[in-house]
């Protein structure tokens, strides 16, 4: 059966590749509207919309959609709009714990799965110079919360409670269980 990742995120492709299955990438076309104060609900809604938008034209396939949001309290912190926004986001998160939710929706011809995972992340205290230098690197610009835990952003993360891959953008443990249930992981360990 065809497996499609409804995302152009190189991080999600990298994580999905860890499961050793062949897949294709078809970008989802959805308006990413946020429900203010509802980060988990927003992430679940967007993951479902992304998967559904691709599945509608590929009903014979298994389509994987995901959405990652960073939040502080109930304030959703999305991708930075520009460098100034990235600096402000990183200042806000400096020295604090925040949460990362990645929602996952899998459409198959037989069944729809919708789940999410949450991890807590603590930044170390960041100097203004560190923030500006990191933003100038360009790494934060396409990432929720303005950092990439798998890149140089790892140097600003002091601690993670939860799954690293949830923070990176795809909850691999939950996805693994779904794909096993769909019998798409033949030959992997049991």
From Swiss-Prot:
Keyword Aminoacyl-tRNA synthetase belongs to the record: no
Cofactors that this protein relies on: a divalent metal cation
Keyword Cytoplasm in record: yes
Main location: cytoplasm
Active site: 67 (proton acceptor)
GO molecular function, one term: UTP diphosphatase activity
Lineage top rank: taxon: Bacteria
Cystine crosslinks: none
Enzyme Commission code: 3.6.1.9
GO biological process per UniProt: nucleotide metabolic process
Compartment(s) where it occurs, according to its Swiss-Prot or TrEMBL record: Cytoplasm
Biological function: Nucleoside triphosphate pyrophosphatase that hydrolyzes dTTP and UTP. May have a dual role in cell division arrest and in preventing the incorporation of modified nucleotides into cellular nucleic acids.
Name this protein carries in UniProt: dTTP/UTP pyrophosphatase
């Amino acid at each position: 059966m065809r497996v499609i990742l409804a995302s152009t995120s190189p991080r999600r492709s990298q994580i999905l590749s860890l499961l050793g299955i062949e897949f294709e990438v078809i970008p989802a076309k959805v308006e990413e509207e946020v429900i203010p104060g509802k980060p988990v609900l927003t992430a679940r809604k967007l993951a479902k919309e992304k998967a559904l938008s691709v599945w509608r034209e590929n009903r014979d396939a298994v389509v994987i959609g995901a959405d990652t949001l960073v939040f502080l309290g109930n304030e959703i912190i999305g991708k930075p709009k520009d460098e100034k926004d990235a600096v402000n986001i990183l200042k806000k998160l400096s020295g604090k714990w925040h949460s990362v939710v990645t929602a996952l929706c899998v459409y198959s011809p037989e069944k729809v799965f919708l789940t999410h995972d949450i991890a807590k992340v603590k930044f170390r205290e960041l100097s203004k110079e560190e923030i500006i230098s990191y933003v100038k690197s360009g790494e934060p610009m396409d990432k929720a919360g303005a950092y990439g835990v798998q890149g140089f952003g790892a140097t600003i993360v002091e601690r993670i409670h939860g799954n690293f891959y949830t923070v990176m953008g795809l909850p691999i443990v939950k996805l693994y269980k779904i794909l096993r249930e769909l019998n798409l992981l033949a030959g992997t360990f049991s």
